[in-house]
Amino acid sequence: MRYLVISDIHANLEAYDTVIAEARRLGYDKVLVLGDLVGYGADPNAICERVRDLKADGLIRGNHDKVGSGVESPEGFNAVARNAIRWTYDNLSSENRDWLAALPEGPMIVDDMIEICHGTPFDEDAYVFDDLDALRAMHAARRPLCLFGHTHVQVGHCLSRDQFGLASADDTRPLSIALEEPNRYLVNPGSVGQPRDGDPRAGFGIVDTTAREVTIYRVEYPIAKAQARIVQEGLPDVLAQRLALGR
């Protein structure tokens, strides 16, 4: 089985369409979506409709989905994020707002191997920023492979009986991680719509349960078009500028 794994789309239609096209070229059987479909970007309705059409086998909410649909207040968001999420709420159709509001909270068990969450298995809004965060998340996970998002950074953590390892993606080739028993893994496929690791290309992952391997990819997309849409909709200019920086 090959699972396409996408996270943190953030209403970036140009990035999303490019990722799906590349994933179809690579081949996949099922889809897992790790949350934050909306926020920051200019096309929340189109993204909701496209993701709904995917008929994902695993789909959970992110913090921007909660606030953008009115489930929670934007308390804790910075000024730019608050501006964008209020615009998102105002511009979402009632159908898409209700659909987002009904998305389930993570973590979610997918199968005997895979669990998904937005932030961590113990708190959907918590971040994995360092080794201690990663260790705590892996100990809380109920499956050998836990897929997470929220940080917008591609990374893979491995915990074996005698050591803890970290694998980071670079800009030259996809990062593949062999899934060996009885190790535990915590993998972030990166952000589709707003990468924050210095690489502006859209990120995604594919888990092959037969080959017991997870691979995380990057793909170039028409950033200028996404930037133009943000400016066109009157969202903060910084949200357009950061797409070219990958920050």
Residue ranges and their predicted role:
Residues 2-10, 113-120, 186-190:
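Active-site-proximal beta-strand elements of phosphoester/diester hydrolases
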Residues 2-99:
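Core catalytic region of metal-dependent phosphoesterases/phosphodiesterases
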Residues 5, 59, 146, 186-188, ...:
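Conserved beta-strand scaffold positions in the cores of enzyme catalytic domains, especially
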Residues 10-15, 39-41, 64-69, 108-109, ...:
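Active-site environment of divalent metal-dependent phosphoester hydrolases
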Residues 26-27, 91-159, 247:
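His/acidic metal-ligating clusters that form di-metal
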Residues 30, 58, 114-115, 145, ...:
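Structural motif
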Residues 70-72, 127, 157-160, 227-229:
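Short, well-ordered secondary-structure micro-motifs
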Residues 161-247:
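Acidic, His/Gly-rich catalytic cores of divalent-metal-dependent hydrolytic chemistry
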